[in-house]
């Protein structure tokens, strides 16, 4: 059976890439595409919006009217919109792939609660390469983390509204967990003025917002006399879109539960 996928935020940069990714993937088809209420894009053909030609799927601003046209919703929007979509999917037994970042603790708790009813893949980054980097960071932290300074540096396009990026925070969390540290306590997100000497157990974060940078992340494990750098650079959003579709296909036979790309890629068995 073909998995029918809906895309939230279809008119955005990521939404258009997701439409392309669904169209080119095997075993799935685009069932619906959504935009915010009153959007000028409502009624536009989703394929034409994404630059791949007519698909016969019109952009809608009403999930209820389209609920019989999809099995799974891919959502890369904003927290407030995603939470509305989560409530709808729980009420209508739809699976979800969530790539939205910037959720507060209440938002994350809502996702966890929803996963008791439906199957969800929730990840800060759907790139296969980035998720492999998460595992490499755990290995590096285990070997070097207690003996060096750790810094996470990330860069994104000027339109990104949250900082540090969800991926950078996930990198910090993987490192902190490996070292038995609490990122809330040991993470340093701003340095200005007279800061005093750096503490060895800090995990520092630096953010760059410029131009059209798709996404770059680098982690330093810096010791006296040597430094190990682990980095990832994305040159196209298609890497995230393809990963999200892969996650959706992986969810097809899952009834409920909260998963991430580590599960999708079976990275714990590396």
UniProtKB/Swiss-Prot annotation:
UniProt-annotated binding residues for NAD(+): 9-14, 35, 99-101, 123-126
Record-level GO BP terms: diaminopimelate biosynthetic process; lysine biosynthetic process via diaminopimelate
Active-site feature positions: 156, 160
Keyword Oxidoreductase assigned: yes
Broadest EC class assigned to this enzyme: oxidoreductase
Record's keyword terms, sorted: Amino-acid biosynthesis, Cytoplasm, Diaminopimelate biosynthesis, Lysine biosynthesis, NAD, NADP, Oxidoreductase
Binding residues annotated for (S)-2,3,4,5-tetrahydrodipicolinate, in chain numbering: 157, 166-167
PROSITE patterns reported for this sequence: DAPB (PS01298)
EC number per UniProt: 1.17.1.8
Localization: Cytoplasm
Family: Belongs to the DapB family.
NCBIfam families the UniProt entry points to: dapB
HAMAP family per the UniProt record, alphabetical: DapB
Name under which the protein is recorded: 4-hydroxy-tetrahydrodipicolinate reductase
Phylogenetic lineage: Bacteria, Pseudomonadati, Pseudomonadota, Gammaproteobacteria, Pasteurellales
